Amino acid sequence: MAGFSLYCFKNPRILFTLPSESPLFVLGSDKCSPATRRPSRKTRGFVVTYAHSNPKIINPKKKSRYGQTLSPYDSDEDDDDDDDDDDDDWLLNDDFAEVTEYEKKKPKSHKQTIAKKSVKKGIVKPEESETDEDDLDLGISPNATSEKKKESWRLDGRGKMSSRKYVEKLYPRLAEEIDIDPKCVPLLDYLSTFGLKESHFVQMYERHMPSLQINVFSAQERLDYLLSVGVKHRDIKRMLLRQPQILQYTVENNLKAHISFLMGLGIPNSKIGQIVAATPSLFSYSVENSLRPTIRYLIEEVGIKETDVGKVVQLSPQILVQRLDITWNTRYMFLSKELGAPRDSVVKMVKKHPQLLHYSIDDGFLPRINFLRSIGMCNSDILKVLTSLTQVLSLSLEDNLKPKYMYLVNELNNEVHILTKYPMYLSLSLDQRIRPRHRFLVELKKVRKGPFPLSSLVPNDESFCQQWAGTSVDTYLAFRQRLLLKEFANKYDKRG
């Protein structure tokens, strides 16, 4: 039956009618009643919107409250690349030798418990557990007005009665934006346990409307599964904001298949959750038609060994959802032409730091290569550095590479060619590693005049104290802390 809604307007507006199959009118056992944008409360008159004829369900020129063009249709890739780039550089810590690794559920209602037990017994599936409006015990007397009957809905299994006004009280900002069905409140309550707020629900609505129309039991089943494979509770919020479609992906037909695929690559169970959290969009890609061909391309075209594929995916999960044929070929051709890099060297770079396939050539590769040239390195030396420490391509010029070069030459009295032997120097923290160790050994008079030995910067603190300083680790750490506080005070004084 076609659904319709009545709203009052001061001036008649354009009518948008909805086909029953449109994303705004989603019917089925797994979804709540359709949620639609609310009109302004200041308007009067009325408009009738039907749900069965016109495919233009949203004005294509309409803007969201955030200035974004609204689309009723989901796009898995519209901004995944931009979003994912923020998360893919797990190992790009300024001091990579010291990289650090990356609640309570609401009490189940009696109704939810019964429904779940029924599912286990095979009586009813989660998707079928949603109660029809006609089956709800609304608690309305026979003499109640039709308007009251229309507004009264059963909120959830807790026995509370709800009206749309009550929904507006629970989620006022969301109710202002969306004509949300009270039957969807249990889903909102559940998602709130992951830290999602009303503004986040609006974002989810704008990104993928049907995500707020999912049966709460189905949503809980799917998120519980993700938690069971290692996704952190704190990561669910970020995943849903980036990929709200996850709530629609069934456990048996989608989630398990993708997790099984990752395990088949040799990725340990302890890393699965981290990969899923970093790239939730992978669930929108077909395992057979997209993900497996990507892996084959890595092996057959790029030249990554099959035994190394799992490591590559762990370092950069976004590689699974990239157009590798484009990203690989353009970067390989650039490095080959610019530096004379042989294929084997570029393959080594990808294996060590697959994130390079995300980096822009104009804004990422060229500025750093030109900087290394400007300090006196020839192409062959640059190639040695990049092959050994590819993450140089990701380091900031102003905040990282330039200050370290100046310290190398002016304070450590070394020549630039030493970087071909110790490229690791460029990846170490100037404040946390390079300067403290240098100053500590100078204070202890443990170094001779001349070039400072960069090999003293390589070992961990314990080995450094034993082999170079001849002191306890606590003594060195106390010195470093004093130095850091002094440097901080100097920077603060300069800003003042």
Curated annotation (Swiss-Prot):
One GO CC term, this protein: chloroplast
Major location category of this protein: plastid
Keyword Magnesium tagged: no
Role noted for this protein: Transcription termination factor required for processing and steady-state levels of plastid transcripts. May play a role in response to abiotic stresses.
InterPro entries in the cross-refs: MTERF (IPR003690), MTERF_sf (IPR038538)
Alphabetical list of Gene3D superfamilies matching this protein: Transcription termination factor 3, mitochondrial
Keyword presence, Isomerase: no
Region described as Disordered: spans on this chain: 57-90, 102-155
GO biological process: chloroplast disassembly; chloroplast organization; DNA-templated transcription termination; regulation of DNA-templated transcription; response to salt stress; root development; shoot system development; singlet oxygen-mediated programmed cell death
Lineage of source species: Eukaryota, Viridiplantae, Streptophyta, Embryophyta, Tracheophyta
GO molecular function terms listed in the Swiss-Prot or TrEMBL record: double-stranded DNA binding
Biased composition (Basic residues): 105-123
A Pfam family: mTERF
Keywords per UniProt: Chloroplast, Plastid, Transcription, Transcription regulation, Transcription termination, Transit peptide
Compartments where located: Plastid, Chloroplast
Protein name: Transcription termination factor MTERF9, chloroplastic
Phenotype of the disrupted gene, per the record: Variegated leaves, reduced growth and altered structure of chloroplasts. Altered responses to sugars, abscisic acid (ABA), salt and osmotic stresses during seedling establishment. Altered root and shoot meristem function resulting in reduced organ growth.
Record field: compositional bias (Acidic residues): 74-90
Similarity-based family: Belongs to the mTERF family.
Biased composition (Basic and acidic residues): 146-155
Transit peptide: 1-44
